[in-house]
């Protein structure tokens, strides 16, 4: 079983965890209907960039 050779410092632990933060999803509003959706994703009503792309 692997056991660490030396204890990691608080600084090294913090540097490792610096990339673990979660970010809120970026939201956009549809120009046609004004609904909010994630960027580069189809809106719940099937529109993307002002065009109907999915039949809902």
From Swiss-Prot:
One example GO MF annotation: structural constituent of ribosome
Gene Ontology biological process terms from the UniProt entry: translation
Ribosomal protein keyword on record: yes
Source organism, top-level taxon: Bacteria
Basic residues composition-biased segments: 7-16
Region (Disordered): 1-56
Keywords associated with the record: Ribonucleoprotein, Ribosomal protein
GO CC aspect terms: large ribosomal subunit
Family: Belongs to the bacterial ribosomal protein bL32 family.
Name of the protein this chain belongs to: Large ribosomal subunit protein bL32
